[in-house]
Amino acid sequence: MIVAGPGSGKTTVLVLRVLRHILVDHLRPEQILITTFTVKAAREIRSRLIEWGEALFEQARTEPISQADREFLAHVDINRVVTGTLDSVCQEALGSDRHADEPPLVTLESFAASVILQRRGGLGASYRNNQAVLGAFLSPFTLDDDPPTTLAEAANTLVPIIDRFIQDRVDVVSFGAADQPEAHRIVSEIDATYRRYLRENNLLDFSGLEEALLERLRARLVPILLADVRAVLVDEYQDTNALQEAIYFELVEACQASFTVVGDDDQSLYRFRGATIELFRAFIDRCRNRLGRAPAGPLYLVENYRSTDEIVAFFNAFVRTDPNFGPARIQPPKPVIRPNNGQGQVPILAMFRPDSQTLANDLTDFIEAVFRGGGYRDPQGRLIDDLRGNAQAGDLGDAVLLASSVLEMQKPYFGNPPKARFTHHLRNAMAARDMKMFNPRGRSLRDIEHVEQLLGLVLLSIDPPDRPGGSLYSSMAITNVAKFFMNRWVAAAQQFLQTNPRPVYGRTLAQEMSEWRDYCLRGIGDKASSRDWPFLDVIYGLIPWLDYFEIDPEGQVYLEALSRAAGQAAGFSAYRGRLIRPQNPGSPDDHGRLSIEAIIRDVLTPLAENVIDVDEEIMPSVPRDRLNVMTIHQAKGLEFPLVIVDVGTDFTTNHQKNRFRRFPEQPSSTAMIEDLLAPFTPDLGALRTQRNGLDRSFEDLIRLYYVAFSRPQSVLMLVGCDKALKWTSNIKNVALGWRQDESWAWRDQSPQPTGRRLPVMVSPPNLLFV
């Protein structure tokens, strides 16, 4: 058990331990399994393994080694180390063991699971028949504590609970027993119907995928990919859930493998995905009880090689600010992180302004000076040196803006247009200086101009308004929200067509669309030679006239999301995401017409209802010429020379709607789900509820900003609005040093008033306000 603080070289330790297993223990690479929490982390480990491993093996071959060692090295292929997220390993392991006569398993994205839950999982009928009961049950888990108003909202609220049934290994029979509340019985019946449908159709959601591997391991039917594993190494173990813990224990026991876990309880961020920090804190006892052996450790990695002395001192002080957080950490208390960077002398910077617009403009001035000008010079001369990007290759990609949310627009309320948030103002301010930012999560897919144009062109191609009887989507039983956005997409496409897009390779956009219309409406034309076409072909057929999706990094991420939505339809949609050539175009029962309706209902409607997430991890690296904008969760495991942390641009009043993001008054919805299920998970529930739900909610906020403050290598800057710094402020915010007992560390550390007049602002000595 290795407890690795931020910047302490845990990736290096994992890679060297793998190489030690190969060179010292003579394990073949394919006998070693490493799991990581993100795809990006897996890529980094694989890259280092290849780079360092090949160099070490080449050097070893030049040494006077035994003939047996020489023969061993001749057959070593470092590429065969099994590396990936646990989900990807499960997919590969189960897929490679499939017999030729078995249908392939299809893994569902969360939006597809939500759709199936509504239509095939019994939620639709149960919600209609028991709306009051289910609404009361689900309301504590919604964003605003109100009952879901639509079936889609009910499904999105219920999915995390049903996922937890598997992730937490809940006794669902007891949960839905006759002596439990009626809502419990209804939910357990929905879960049973949903799981049965998935089994009968060879579908798996991600929790079901992991459960399938666990069942194989328990039956000692170890998949071929893992059958010869002799060493298991797990990164970010603090974010493991009970199901994943069971998989690791079963695999280690079945294969008699060595077992190494690396993690940090202070950096656990994924409670909302089922992560259970208590499993890491209690790892030694749980390992002893389950495997009969106590692991070595905990071994502490406390030398920080990433950050300057000032940054390490800042995040060390932050994590110890609230004494109520102490009992939530590994006991006995672990050593304090020590700086080993050898650089420093730049204090923690703080930029606070009256409003987010002014802040965006001033921050853009700062960024431009650092990366496009001669460097940032403090007007008052408080910095020893100017701050400037690397002279050889420095660019905007060396900086990142981190925030709990990176959305650029607030949600619209009561029919009013949405208000711009800080990130939107920053995008515009940077664009005015000919600088760009990379924030694919900042805007909903349905609202992005180029996405609107593409989806509008798609609708005009397969469901044009001149169809006899009008377009299909306008009369379908889909939500008014979906119809609103589809109408908007069509209008955007029509406006785009008026610009007369240039031909591509001698072919016009009008020709491409006309061929799809001929096929979909009448079953004629060049495309009629095929009985059916994948819907993806329509999307990619239109891309040449919208080169934004090919050349812009954000556009590439958006195109992947659209493609994923279309591809997922193959797993659950009536026509598997394909357009069928019509045989009787005028008939409402024609398969061509029905296949178009299936595409509209199962692909375009989820996009219009904003339930498709982007996945920027498809980008092998972030663009060097853009300012990265990430949620703190996304930045886990990454590092940047300059890190700007938004600690409260949204919080200009003490509004109750945003308190859960800064100073919760009640347990988070995730903590309440944990408390709900605790009585039905005897092992996990007792461990988890040693701390109450409100305490756990505060812990999550402290860990979130601890991770943010420990990302920078050279410079950390906090940004926010002035109102939060007023001496008399009631805008309590964990990120600004507020403790759970409502005392304020930043105010305590500021020069104290000597007379009746109070200072206007707090001014903690460890911050340099610019």
Residue ranges and their predicted role:
Residues 1-9, 33, 41, 82, ...:
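Conserved helicase NTPase motor core
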Residues 491-501, 624-627, 678-740:
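C-terminal accessory regions
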Residues 257, 286, 389-553, 560-563:
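ATPase/helicase motor core of nucleic-acid motors
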Residues 1-6, 30, 73-74, 79, ...:
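Inter-lobe coupling/hinge region of RecA-like P-loop helicase motors
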Residues 1-101, 223, 230, 285, ...:
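P-loop NTPase Walker
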